[in-house]
């Protein structure tokens, strides 16, 4: 079949914006040269010539409830999961169809954990997770680093926190990636500077996960990239509200926090403090009529030295009863119902502390798996 015209980068970007993306960057596949085999998208689509990265703004208002300490559900839903698993895929579908109608193949990669052979938290290879289907190929599934993809597509830079910053939204962006055999004009690597090394991300991180002085340096497409050394597990612990109880209003005996996914802390340093700082310094192109945070107003903190009375009803249902949001009940649910059977999940019994190593050699954590 003959096609009337070739798609250009401008065509793709216009379509992406029309379908609902806030940002769109494009790179050529050669920019992935030097990537570890388990993270190299060229093994996913060897015929790909270009990759497309779509950016979706995190609504600033989705952070407001945690900022005020009064609503903790909006950020993990509207600012997190809904962007990664609902809106991002909904925009990719029509873009894939649009490009297919012009004769191009497109591989959509959604920003959600799947069966990656690389641990998405620590970045370590999962021994025994899967087998290569042919000699020389990586273990399935290949894990593409979306922030690196955004950098290679010229969309911004890494901040000290390792969170990706764009000139438009700063840290308030989530990404999806598409691989295509369309040969598109790549965007230049971003040469500007958004992060001014203020280290507000370090000072305000509840998990104390970001080093103040130690850094990591890597080379991407011939450019040296640097960010602060990150303790990934401290980040996980802090994000879930377990590091600084003065920033977590929920009681252990009444752990509705499990219904909030993984964002109790609300990205206090790497997103909220960073965003507020960049806005105050007029570093971002997308502006607001009112400031996000009054720098003179102290941030709320909980005095846990005071006794807190837990009602008998809470004890009966959540501690002594079968309430699903109890830690043990949630663990058992994930081990059996969510996977079909405990055996299928490689788990012999529900761990009492969320830290049992299963048959695949993975640490099983109901907050992550």
In which residue ranges do the predicted regions lie?
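Catalytic cores of enzyme domains
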Residues: 35, 77, 81-294
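Short linear sequence motifs
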Residues: 12, 68, 308-311, 326
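Eukaryote-specific, cytoplasm-facing alpha-helical/coiled-coil scaffolding segments in long proteins
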Residues: 296-304
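Non-catalytic, usually N-terminal nucleic-acid engagement modules in DNA/RNA processing proteins
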Residues: 1-93, 369
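Long, compositionally biased charged/polar accessory segments in the mid-to-C-terminal portions
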Residues: 291, 310-362
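Long, low-complexity, intrinsically disordered extramembrane tails
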Residues: 364-368
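Short alpha-helix boundary/capping motifs
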Residues: 44-45, 127, 302-303
């Amino acid at each position: 079949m003959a096609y009337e015209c070739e798609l250009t980068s401008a065509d793709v970007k216009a379509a992406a914006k029309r379908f609902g993306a806030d940002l769109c960057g494009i790179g050529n596949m050669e920019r992935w040269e030097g990537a570890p085999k388990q993270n190299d998208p060229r093994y996913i689509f060897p015929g790909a010539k270009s990759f497309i990265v779509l950016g979706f703004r995190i609504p600033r208002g989705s952070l407001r409830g945690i900022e005020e300490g009064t609503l903790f559900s909006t950020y993990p839903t509207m600012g997190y999961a809904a962007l990664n698993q609902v809106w991002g895929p909904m925009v990719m579908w029509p873009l894939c169809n649009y490009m297919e109608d012009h004769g191009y193949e497109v591989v959509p990669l959604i920003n959600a954990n799947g069966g990656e052979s690389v641990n998405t938290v620590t970045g370590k290879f999962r021994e025994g997770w899967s087998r290569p289907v042919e000699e020389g190929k990586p273990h399935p599934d290949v894990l593409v680093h979306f922030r690196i993809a955004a950098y290679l597509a010229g969309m911004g830079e890494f901040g000290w926190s390792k969170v990706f910053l764009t000139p438009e939204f700063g840290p308030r962006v989530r990404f999806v990636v598409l691989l295509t055999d369309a040969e598109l004009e790549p965007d230049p690597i971003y040469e500007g500077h958004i992060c001014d090394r203020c280290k507000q991300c370090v000072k305000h991180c509840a998990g104390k996960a970001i080093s103040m002085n130690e850094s990591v340096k890597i080379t991407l497409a011939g450019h040296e990239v640097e960010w602060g050394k990150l303790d990934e597990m401290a980040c996980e612990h802090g994000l879930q509200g377990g590091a600084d109880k003065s920033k977590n209003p929920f009681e252990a005996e009444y752990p509705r926090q499990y219904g909030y996914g993984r964002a109790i802390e609300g990205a206090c340093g790497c997103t909220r403090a960073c965003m507020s700082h960049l806005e105050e310094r007029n570093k971002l192109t997308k502006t607001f009529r009112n400031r996000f945070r009054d720098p003179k107003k102290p941030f709320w903190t909980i005095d846990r030295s005071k006794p807190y009375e837990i009602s008998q009803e809470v004890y009966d249902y959540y501690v002594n009863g079968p309430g699903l949001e109890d830690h043990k009940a949630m663990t058992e649910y994930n081990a059996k119902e969510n996977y079909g059977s405990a055996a299928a999940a490689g788990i012999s019994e529900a761990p009492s502390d969320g830290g049992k190593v299963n048959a695949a050699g993975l640490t099983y954590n109901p907050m992550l798996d």
